[in-house]
């Protein structure tokens, strides 16, 4: 009979315990189990915005347009995240802790994978304050944080539950910039915590890029769980090698932009509108190759274009002479780039 030192039940329970503990500590996203009860491997997320047509009107004069609801839709596909580790019977006998260490590493790598995906989604935030992470001007970074919080407050006045996520390089800059303004609050102590600014706990993560940092509430990012943590074992009886696979099936998505603000560097490439002719039904232009969307505004209406290799085009209501066209390009992890207004 083979010498199996850890049963499947014990290994499965160890992995779940390690992973669930770490995920429950996440300040940056929350879980949703709705996919577990549904068939299919894709989900469409719609983000709605209503335009503002509230205006002062003179006697006998009314509004020229209506308040309309626009939305953007993004499709996400469920993915399987898998890790694999192995050990020999002899290794486990020499030092039993090696198994726990390997399993702990798998759980940590799983969490790190989800964290990287969450940060990639954070980079799509549209409430952005431009920040160079280099200025030595007094109160520069503190003022940027306050401006970012103001963007959140405009739609969500409650600042509780927010955390600022920064990179290691930003940590050095922030400590120099803020000095004593970086308050250390005992109640906020956790892994990566370096202090609080403007009442917001600051946490460092190696997964965060140097070009942006994020002020985020868990409501902004959702982990859609398709299947919980599962483990599978294999064993080479001849070499006495034990192999364990760990899997989690789901997807990470930015689901509520009202709960996140980003401080980010400027894009290096301009957004440009190609002037359309009178009667045109499309508006086109160029932007940075890494842009994921361009929002075009004509009067009170907005349209969203999805760029390809730095070029974009979107169908619009027929444009007329005198129409003013604006466009803003969004790149993951960078401040939006506004195009020069074009008049038809």
Question: Residue spans of the language-model regions?
Answer:
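N-terminal "assembly arms/tails" that initiate or stabilize quaternary assembly
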Residues: 1-73, 221-222, 226-227
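Glycine-centered loop/turn motifs
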Residues: 40, 51, 57-64, 210-211, ...
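Short acidic, glycine/tyrosine-flanked loop/strand segments centered on an H-E-D-like triad
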Residues: 70-94
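Alpha-helical scaffold segments that mediate packing/assembly in large oligomeric complexes
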Residues: 88-155, 262-266
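Extended, solvent-exposed, turn-rich assembly/linker loops in the middle of proteins
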Residues: 126-194
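Glycine/small-residue-rich hydrophobic helix-like segments
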Residues: 191-234
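Extended, compositionally biased alpha-helical segments that mediate assembly or anchoring
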Residues: 234-267
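Ser/Thr-rich low-complexity repeats and stalk/linker segments
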Residues: 267-344
């Amino acid at each position: 009979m083979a010498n199996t030192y850890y049963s499947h039940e014990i290994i499965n329970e160890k992995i779940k315990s390690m992973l669930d503990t770490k995920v429950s500590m996440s300040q940056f996203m929350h879980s949703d189990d709705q996919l577990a009860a549904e068939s299919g491997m894709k989900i469409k997320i719609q983000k709605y915005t209503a335009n503002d047509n509230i205006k002062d009107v003179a006697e006998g004069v009314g509004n020229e347009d209506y308040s309309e609801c626009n939305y953007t839709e993004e499709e996400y596909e469920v993915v399987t995240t898998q890790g694999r580790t192995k050990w020999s019977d002899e290794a486990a006998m020499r030092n039993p802790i090696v198994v726990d260490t390997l399993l702990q590493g798998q759980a940590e790598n799983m969490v790190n994978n989800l964290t990287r995906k969450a940060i990639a989604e954070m980079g799509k935030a549209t409430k952005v304050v431009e920040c160079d992470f280099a200025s030595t001007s007094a109160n520069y970074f503190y003022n940027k944080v306050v401006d970012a919080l103001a963007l959140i407050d405009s739609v969500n006045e409650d600042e509780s539950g927010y955390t600022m996520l920064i990179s290691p390089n930003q940590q050095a800059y922030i400590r120099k910039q803020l000095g004593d303004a970086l308050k250390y609050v005992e109640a906020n102590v956790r892994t990566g915590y370096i202090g609080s600014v403007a009442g917001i706990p600051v946490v460092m993560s190696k997964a965060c890029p140097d070009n942006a940092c994020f002020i985020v509430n868990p409501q902004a990012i959702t982990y859609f769980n398709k299947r919980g943590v599962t483990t599978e074992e294999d064993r080479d009886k001849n070499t006495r090698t034990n192999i364990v696979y760990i899997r989690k099936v789901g997807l990470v998505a930015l689901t509520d932009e009202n709960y996140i603000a980003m401080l980010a560097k400027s894009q290096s490439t301009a957004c440009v509108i190609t002037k359309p002719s009178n009667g045109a039904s499309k508006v086109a232009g160029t932007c940075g190759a890494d842009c994921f969307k361009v929002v075009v505004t004509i009067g009170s209406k907005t349209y969203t274009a999805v760029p390809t290799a730095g070029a974009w085009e979107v169908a619009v209501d027929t444009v007329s002479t005198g129409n003013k066209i604006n466009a803003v390009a969004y790149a993951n992890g960078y401040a939006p780039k506004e195009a020069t207004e074009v008049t038809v």
